[in-house]
Each structure stands twice: as structure tokens, then as C-alpha cells.
């Protein structure tokens, strides 16, 4: 009986250890999978949002990244389509977009994730629409980026952004032309013919 008990305890303890290791590996796998999916939704979705605000086009793709309720309440997107956006007077041809994900956490068993991101648009290329020349400044206004607390929700196996709260503001500085140095006069004037 003593040997049977030892034999059973040996296999039970090994089974428990293997079960714990497999559980940790499965949990880590799902956390990584959720984090990767969320990261893609954040980077692609927020860039598509900025593109839509700057150019007033491409709104058809926003539903892939944002929940419909969020899109209906986003004042920046509404401004792009009702003509109140400061970028509506410009033909934006290109922009640089920088998104830094500072914090991202998604439990494998949870359908809600939160993250902290910093969004910047360091440069915007374009020019004033011909119909608006003289009405607005030739310099395109700087993008008001910032730090955001973003909430995502998984529904139907897809992560979508459902909330975006700005916790800090970052305004890109206006580009100023680099000063050119004044040439120094020749110290040796005798060398001149």
C-alpha cells in the first residue's frame, strides 16, 4: 500500500505541475495574441481617424476599428464632414503620423482592454484650396496631438475602440525657417587683386 500511495502521489504531483505549466503557457499565448490584435487596431485605426479628419475621406474604413457609437460621438470626425474642421480649407496630400503605445493590458478572459497612447502628427503637407485662398493662412494649422486613455472592447472576435479620453495635449511647434549665417568678410584684404 505504501508503494501504491507513493506511486500515485508521484504521478499526481507531476500532472499538477504539467497542468500549471500548460495553463501559464496558454494564458501567455492569449495575452500576446490579444495584445498584438489590439496594437494593430490602435495603430491602423488611429491613423485612419487622423487621415479622415485631415482629408475628409476614407471614413468607410473606420468601422473596422471603431465602434459605431464612438464614431457618432467623435466631434473631430463630425467636424471633418460638416465643414467646421480647421483642415477643411486645405488639400492635405501627406502627413507623418507617430503613435507610441505606453501601456497596454488585456487579460485573456476579459472582453475589455485599456491602454495609454501618445499621438503626434509632426508634419502635414498640403496647400490651401483655390476656393479658399486669401480667406485662410497659407500655413496648415498644427495637429493637436496628445496622450489618450483608450478603451477597447471585443465583440464577435474583433477588438474595436469604444472610448478615447484625452489626458494630455501636445501641439506640434510651427516650423520656423533655419537662419542662414551671414558670410564673414575676408580677413586678408591684401590677397584681393
What are these regions (language model features)?
Residues 129-193:
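Low-complexity, intrinsically disordered terminal/linker segments enriched in charged
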Residues 1-11:
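N-terminal Lys/Arg-rich, disordered targeting/topogenic segments
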Residues 9-19, 39, 43-64, 175-193:
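Terminal "cap-and-tail" regions of soluble proteins that handle hydrophobic small molecules
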Residues 13-32:
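Hydrophobic membrane-insertion alpha-helices, especially the h-region
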Residues 84-136, 191:
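Surface-exposed, charged secondary-structure patches
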Residues 28-102, 106-107:
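Core segments of small alpha/beta cavity-forming domains
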Residues 54, 119-125, 152-156:
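Beta-strand elements of well-folded, non-transmembrane domains
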Amino acid at each position: 500500500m505504501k508503494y501504491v500511495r507513493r506511486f500515485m502521489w508521484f504521478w499526481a504531483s507531476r500532472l499538477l505541475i504539467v497542468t500549471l505549466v500548460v495553463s501559464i503557457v496558454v494564458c501567455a499565448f492569449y495575452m500576446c495574441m490579444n495584445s498584438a490584435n489590439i496594437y494593430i487596431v490602435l495603430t491602423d485605426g488611429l491613423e485612419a481617424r487622423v487621415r479622415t479628419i485631415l482629408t475628409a475621406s476614407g471614413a468607410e474604413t473606420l468601422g473596422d476599428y471603431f465602434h459605431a457609437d464612438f464614431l457618432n460621438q467623435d466631434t473631430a470626425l463630425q467636424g471633418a464632414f460638416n465643414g467646421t474642421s480647421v483642415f477643411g480649407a486645405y488639400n492635405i496630400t501627406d502627413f507623418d503620423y507617430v503613435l507610441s503605445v505606453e501601456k497596454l493590458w488585456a487579460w485573456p478572459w476579459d472582453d475589455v482592454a485599456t491602454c495609454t497612447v501618445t499621438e503626434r502628427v509632426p508634419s502635414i503637407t498640403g496647400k490651401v484650396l483655390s476656393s479658399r485662398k486669401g480667406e485662410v493662412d497659407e500655413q496648415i494649422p498644427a495637429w493637436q496631438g496628445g496622450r489618450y486613455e483608450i478603451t477597447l472592447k471585443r465583440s464577435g472576435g474583433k477588438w474595436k475602440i469604444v472610448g478615447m479620453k484625452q489626458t494630455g495635449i501636445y501641439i506640434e511647434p510651427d516650423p520656423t525657417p533655419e537662419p542662414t549665417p551671414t558670410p564673414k568678410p575676408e580677413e586678408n584684404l591684401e590677397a584681393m587683386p
